[in-house]
Amino acid sequence: MTDTTSLAEKLTAHFKDTISGCETDRDQITLVVTPSHLLSTCEALRDEDDFSFSQLVDLCGVDYSTYGQVDWATEETTATGFSRGRETKTITIDTDQRFAVVYHLLSIKHNHRLRLRCYLPEENPTLASVTGVWSSANWYEREAYDMFGILFEGHPD
């Protein structure tokens, strides 16, 4: 059993009631957390000795409204390339999962990395601020608000 598999099993067992998924791809674990359980999950990931994710490496907002679209395909030269600015396309998306906030965590103690993903709806994308858990989230949350309109409740600014 690899360290990644072992960690994924521990995470799934410990957070079975507060997560909506745990995926492993390319030796990277992604824990999908529901918005209502984000803060308690982050505190446990930081404080519990089995995890000790003491460092938030990165936080970013994601807009999935055009995810998977190939507007910038450049496999061949054409006069119709780069159509994003010229054509209007109708895209069907799940409005309950239009946005996501993705957190990249590091456990220096265990030398583990973890990705948390929290999906947010198109209408009023709001999430608890994790600045009380990791102070480094401050500017990242500001940036996600500026770029995507994701509001972080309890943010110091």
Please tell me what each predicted stretch does.
Residues M1-D157:
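Terminal low-complexity/charged segments
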